[in-house]
Every structure is written in C-alpha cells, then in structure tokens.
C-alpha cells in the first residue's frame, strides 16, 4: 500500500517571505539551527517550515553568496554543490526509515519557495 504525500497549505501562513524581511536568514549562518552537515559554505539543514506531512524535509544552502544560482557558479563550485546534494540524497536512499527520496532544487521567484538567497 502506498502512502500519499500530503501538502499542508497552512504552513505557508507561518513561513517568512523574502519581501517581508529586512535580512535573509540564510545569510546569517550563526542563527541557523538543526544543521545536519557542512562542507565549505554549503550547509545541509532541516527545513523549518515543512509543507509536506510525515516527511524528512531538508534544505541545502548552496552558497554563502546571496542571490546567486547554479548557472553563475564556477565549474568547481557547481561540482561541489551537485556532489554534496547527491551525497546527501544517496545517504537518505540507503536509510531504511525511508521508502523514497525526492531531490529537487527550489530557486527563484517562480519556484514556490518563500526565501530567496
């Protein structure tokens, strides 16, 4: 039997949005909580506002540089980010607690994310 992934729309009411804050929470490393791993300026942490119920939602902050994207990275930085993400994906894939793992990038105003970094 499969278990559906349930999107909890009520979480969106509590999430801070980029347009309503004076500073980016991802730019202040010292205030981040629930950090799972770090490599250089790449950080893997628990999502503070998980919109999918009964999941293990994490976030990867790819760079300390605000408002940059994969297309702007050097080849080496892009390799580091992709390798780090795949390493974490594989780690969760091997974990017997999970039946499946979804890895997606959520960036830009059309992505549905509430924080731009």
What positions do the PLM features span?
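Active-site microenvironments that recognize anionic phosphate/pyrophosphate groups
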Residues: 1-116
